[in-house]
Amino acid sequence: MHTQVLFEHPLNEKMRTWLRIEFLIQQLSVNLPLADHADALHFFRNIGDLLDVFERGEVRTELLKELERQQRKLQAWVEVPGVDQSRIEALRQQLKTAGSILISAPRIGQQLREDRLIALVRQRLSIPGGCCSFDLPTLHIWLHLPQEQRDAQVETWIASLNPLNQALTLILDLIRNSSPFRKQTSLNGFYQDNGDDADLLRLQLALDSQLYPQISGHKSRFAIRFMPLDSENGLVPERLDFELACC
């Protein structure tokens, strides 16, 4: 059982979007293979949410900019004595490859957007109980196809996101590993500090404290208020130790 709980909080809109995309892509695989109605609806709901996120901004443009920014950051490390040059070069090549694949890929989500079954289910998801067999006979018969046939179709849908997912995973790994965790202490449940142009806050709390952080702020400055899970009887200690990374 985990003794620490990790919280992540974006400090700008692009990071907020990326974390949502990462979460939704991870959710696509949770209930595979799609063996029943509940598993299928979970899958299609996450597909629909992903398409909604894609339609709100220039996801590919922001990722390509970030891939270039990370390459420049790695270039600055080349001249630092003692740095593992082979590791730096390997990461730069990964960034270049991810960028080339992403820029040559079709519009993000286009294959999913044009799929008839996904479109039909997506239309009905906003209606309470709108995915019954009489509302969606297409989904009903699809769920009665051989498992292997459904698995192959699901695999094709997920694979269409690979160019995006590979670039996003690489970027988030680099950002998350850009700063170590450091011990901090809050006073009376409150902590604030400068963001130093960070994109992401990562905070670790002891599980047995049964506290969670409410974080506000941006890349220049942020504030953290610790709240008890039990809002009526829970207590926040006068001094609370936690670990924080500004990435």
Curated annotation (Swiss-Prot):
Cell division factor that enhances FtsZ-ring assembly. Directly interacts with FtsZ and promotes bundling of FtsZ protofilaments, with a reduction in FtsZ GTPase activity. Interacts with FtsZ. Gene3D superfamilies: YacF-like, YacF-like domains. It comes from Citrobacter koseri (strain ATCC BAA-895 / CDC 4225-83 / SGSC4696). This is Cell division protein ZapD. The gene is zapD. Keywords: Cell cycle, Cell division, Cytoplasm, Septation. Belongs to the ZapD family. It is found in: Cytoplasm. GO terms for cellular component: cell division site; cytoplasm. GO terms for biological process: division septum assembly; FtsZ-dependent cytokinesis. InterPro entries: ZapD, ZapD_C, ZapD_sf. It comes from the Bacteria. Pfam families: ZapD. Its main location: cytoplasm.
